[in-house]
Each structure stands twice: as C-alpha cells, then as structure tokens.
Amino acid sequence: MQDTSGTQPIQTDALVIGAGPAGLFQVFQLGLQGIRCHVVDALPHVGGQCAQLYGDKPIYDIPGIPVCTGHELVQLLQRQVAPMDAQLHLSQQVSQLQRMDDGRWLAQTTHGLELHARSVFIAAGVGAFVPKALKVPGVELLAAGQLHYHPADLEMVRGQTAIVHGGDEEAVAAAIACADRAQATYLLYRRDAFQASAVLLERLQELRDSGAIRVVIGQITQLHADAGQLRAVQWMDGEGQEHELAAQQLVVCLGISPRLGPVAEWGLAMERKQLLVNPATQATDAPGIYAIGDIVSYPGKHKLILCGFHEATMAAFAAAEYLQGEKPLLQYTTTSARLHAILGVSHPQA
C-alpha cells in the first residue's frame, strides 16, 4: 500500500474509510473483484484500534491463526493486501461526504484532499482515533511546528531542546528517539513509572543514567511563547510548586481516544451512533455506500474482527454488482487464473 497525496481531485472506483483489520480486508476483497481503491485513516499508520490498543496483546479467535498480537495481525493483513496496490492517505479524516450530480460521492479530507468515488466503504470502527490534546494556557499562542502529537518522525527536534510529555510506550519510545537527535531531552510525566516494554524501559534507564534523558516528575500547567515560538514549559511538582523548563519542541503522547466525528453528519441512517445496514450486502440507505465492522448495526451483529472480515466480503460482492451492473461470478483463489494474476501468483512451467 502506498501513501500518496495531491491537489487534484482523485477519481476512484472505491474509497475505504478506515484502515483497521476490517478496512484492510475490504481492500483485499475489492481487489479480488478487480476494484481499485483509496484508503483514508486518521492515524499515522494502518491497523486502527487493533494496532493502537491491542498491538502487543494476544488475539486467539482469528481462523487459522491460533494466536497472534494485534501488530502481527496487521502485518499479515498488509502482506495480504499488498498486491491490490491501494493508495493510502494517513493522518487525515474524511470531513465531508456528499452525493455528486452524476451519482458518485465527493469526499473531502482534513488535509484538503478531494476524492470522487463511485462507491464508499465505511470501516471506521468505534470512530476515528485522535490524539488527546494538551489543554493548558499558552497552547493557542504557538505557531505550527513546535507542538507535536504522536509524531511518526522526530527529525524536527535535531539540535534543539525537546520535552516529551507522557508515560506510555509511545512517550518512552519518543524520548529515546529524541535523545539521538536533540541537544537536550526531557521526559515529563506525573509519576516516575512508565508503561512500556521491558526492552524500552531498560534503554530508558541507560539513557537516564548517562544523562541523555532527564526525567521530570510533574504536570504541565502553561506554555510560554515569544512571537509564536515556544520558549518554556511551566510545570508543577507534587508539592504544588511551579517551575519553568526552557524548550523549543514539545512532543505530547497522552494517548488517543475514538470520536465518531463527521460520520454522524453525512445523512446516513444511524441508531445509537452506529450505521444501519442490510446484512446481506452491508449497504447503507445511501446508494453506493457500504459499512462494515464495529461502526455498523444489524440484527445479530457481533463486534468481532472475524465478523468484520465476513462483512467486507459481502460488501465487496454487493459493490461489484452495483458498479458492474451484474452479479459477479464466484471464483476461488485456489483455482482461478484471473485471481492468481491479481494476487501475483506464478505457476512454474511443467
């Protein structure tokens, strides 16, 4: 899967909203039907809730896989969908979705991307995962490029003083990465106890012992800026005393939370914050829009990953009929030469 962006409207047969396990398998099933697609997700990486909340936890109910972690399942799905060459647009949400005069759907993202899609597949799970914001005075005074939420790249701290705020695995990993780039690195958290893997905690301790990372125990109370440039972070210790720490970059890793967001504003039939679908097709009440996974509701619905895989299959067959005007021929990946060609399966000459 490729991460792409552009300024011209993108024309596509299918738009998949959400890159969790259900969304990834939707890409695979659409690919088997010969339908190319683009994928949009709010997170900076694929995997959705599975990777974000259960990345290192065991999963036991995936058919044919006795046990795997969330990260391992996502990696397997990425390998499986690779032949479909889906175009990926990360760290952005679909903010608007409206019907065009020709029957297609116009989708706009929070990064200004515009897509014209013949069909749309909503696999948004429990909602888009967005970082928990730092809510202290002074945040609004900062110019762009100094306050970073869960950044995928930390090159911007090179040669500067960086403060990483948080106590989970992402915060620890970010502090370790900053130590290799920043002039000085501080890890600021409300207590001296961090939730991370043993390997990361061991590395953190090594860097603390060497002075490459300095741990500050407290809570941020205010940010100070000069002409939009971060100057210092004000923090309060356990005894209520206020202190200032000079810094040019602030990395915030306070976790993420799901928000239903714009989905509720698209005019689709909903019940208790879930989209109503026909379980035979996963179709919503809008022509060409399908929904799968935890975001949907129908009689007998179960919020399980494997149910999302089934729903993705039903949606792909229904969409193929909708887009092509006839019911698709059922073919099997074990024997179909057409499907083998799509999957890149080669057959040695006898």
From Swiss-Prot:
FAD binds at D41, Q49, Y54, V94, F129, D294, T335. Keywords: FAD, Flavoprotein, NADP, Oxidoreductase. Its EC number is 1.18.1.2. Binds 1 FAD per subunit. Its cofactor is FAD. GO terms for molecular function: ferredoxin-NADP+ reductase activity; flavin adenine dinucleotide binding; NADP binding. InterPro entries: FAD/NAD-bd_sf, FAD/NAD-binding_dom, Fd--NADP_Rdtase_type_2, Ferredoxin-NADP_redctase_2. It is an enzyme of class 1 (oxidoreductase). The keyword Lyase does not apply. It catalyses: 2 reduced [2Fe-2S]-[ferredoxin] + NADP(+) + H(+) = 2 oxidized [2Fe-2S]-[ferredoxin] + NADPH. Belongs to the ferredoxin--NADP reductase type 2 family. Homodimer. HAMAP family: FENR2 (MF_01685). This is Ferredoxin--NADP reductase.
